[in-house]
Amino acid sequence: MKQDSRFPNLFILDHPLIQHKLTHMRDKDTSTRTFRELLREITLLMGYEITRNLPITTKRVETPLVEIDAPVIAGKKLAIVPVLRAGVGMSDGLLELIPSARVGHIGVYRANDHRPVEYLVRLPDLEDRIFILCDPMVATGYSAAHAIDVLKRRGVPGERLMFLALVAAPEGVQVFQDAHPDVKLYVASLDSHLDDHAYIVPGLGDAGDRLFGTKN
């Protein structure tokens, strides 16, 4: 895991397996089926990395030989909140890693001015719960920042929120950081820039279209 000095709350997951799978996802000739499988696999690997600092407590258990105080994750079940629609493809990998997690959804689409328009919010109970929000792309950063706003407006503090994405543009990371300096943003790659259509370069195309086999 590495950081970029420009963005204190950005963490780049540079594990070789994550980078290998991301390269195959970038390939324009990768099929929808393979893209979907790779998204699940890479999200599972990234989920392992971002959960390494979850709070721990102990529980009394009886092994076949003795009783011991053994470590377990403290607090309530985690919640996974994909940002629709492409974020849904990431929730499968996280649920494979954390099958007991609760799942919410935030529906946001990008208007012509690239600003987010919210159309759906469904969340589990919020008190004392850690939330992992996910969306493959942080391009302009407005949708990611808006999704965090949704939870903060409902009283969830930044220290109980984290955002997981595959690739991000510096412009979007700056927007996210300015809006939420207290929320950690985890990505597999910080790419070069946004083009004139607000697509990430080099990026991987439209993640939703590639995931679901649709045309923009």
UniProtKB/Swiss-Prot annotation:
It catalyses: UMP + diphosphate = 5-phospho-alpha-D-ribose 1-diphosphate + uracil. SUPFAM superfamilies: PRTase-like. Allosterically activated by GTP. Binds 1 Mg(2+) ion per subunit. The magnesium is bound as Mg-PRPP. Its EC number is 2.4.2.9. Catalyzes the conversion of uracil and 5-phospho-alpha-D-ribose 1-diphosphate (PRPP) to UMP and diphosphate. One of its GO terms (molecular function) is magnesium ion binding. It comes from Burkholderia pseudomallei (strain 668). One of its GO terms (biological process) is uracil salvage. InterPro entries: PRibTrfase_dom (IPR000836), PRTase-like (IPR029057), Upp_B (IPR034332), UPRTase/APRTase (IPR050054), Ura_phspho_trans (IPR005765). It is an enzyme of class 2 (transferase). Pathway: Pyrimidine metabolism; UMP biosynthesis via salvage pathway; UMP from uracil: step 1/1. Keywords: Allosteric enzyme, Glycosyltransferase, GTP-binding, Magnesium, Nucleotide-binding, Transferase. It holds the Pfam family UPRTase. Gene3D superfamilies: 3.40.50.2020. It comes from the Bacteria. Uracil binds at residues 200, 205-207. 5-phospho-alpha-D-ribose 1-diphosphate binds at residues 85, 110, 135-143, 206. CDD domains: PRTases_typeI (cd06223). Its cofactor is Mg(2+). Belongs to the UPRTase family. This is Uracil phosphoribosyltransferase.
